[in-house]
């Protein structure tokens, strides 16, 4: 075996629940990475870089582990919308996104701390938002509090009601951990799935 344990570099309950679908034992660890986009960085590049940085940050503390990192950025016409952090910012993001098609770039990285091998894939999802009224946006933000969610919409919960449609290769990508891509990477590391 080329690793001693599997570690998810995230404290997200949604990512943890998704990874549990693989029925593999794993731990979680906070990555403590600055998620600020670099100047002139394209949205998929930001997501890829942060997914790898998160996995590497945790791999330093778990030198025999296989570490999974993930990151998601929402982009509207090339502009990145990260985690809003405040109610006002969440409302502002959703006001900008109403009626628009937003691309959610979700990257997943696997770092084998023992061998140094790094794998990363990016899975985009196109999301068409409804024409939302200000009242709908305020009600949603008040009920859901999507302050820690790229683009301010949690599709795995009440946020699904904000959408007209979505399209992508992996339905789990929009929730924050693309399991189809991840299963490919874990099999490449020797894990037996299923």
Swiss-Prot record:
Q: Which Pfam families match?
A: Maf (PF02545)
Q: Where is this site: Important for substrate specificity?
A: 14, 72, 156
Q: Name one GO cellular component term.
A: cytoplasm
Q: Which CDD domains is this protein grouped with?
A: Maf
Recorded GO molecular functions are: nucleoside triphosphate diphosphatase activity
Q: Could you confirm whether the keyword Cytoplasm appears in this record?
A: yes
Residues annotated as the enzyme's active site: 71
UniProt keyword Protein biosynthesis, yes or no: no
Q: What does this protein do?
A: Nucleoside triphosphate pyrophosphatase that hydrolyzes 7-methyl-GTP (m(7)GTP). May have a dual role in cell division arrest and in preventing the incorporation of modified nucleotides into cellular nucleic acids.
A GO biological process this protein is involved in? nucleotide metabolic process
Give cofactor(s), names only. Answer: a divalent metal cation
- UniProt keyword list: Cytoplasm, Hydrolase, Nucleotide metabolism
The Enzyme Commission number assigned here is 3.6.1.-
State the reactions this protein catalyses: N(7)-methyl-GTP + H2O = N(7)-methyl-GMP + diphosphate + H(+)
Localization annotation = Cytoplasm
Q: Which residues form a coiled coil?
A: none
Name the family. Belongs to the Maf family. YceF subfamily.
Q: Which domain of life is it from?
A: Bacteria
| InterPro entries in the record | ITPase-like_fam, Maf-like
Q: Which organism is it from?
A: Aromatoleum aromaticum (strain DSM 19018 / LMG 30748 / EbN1) (Azoarcus sp. (strain EbN1))
Protein name, as recorded: 7-methyl-GTP pyrophosphatase
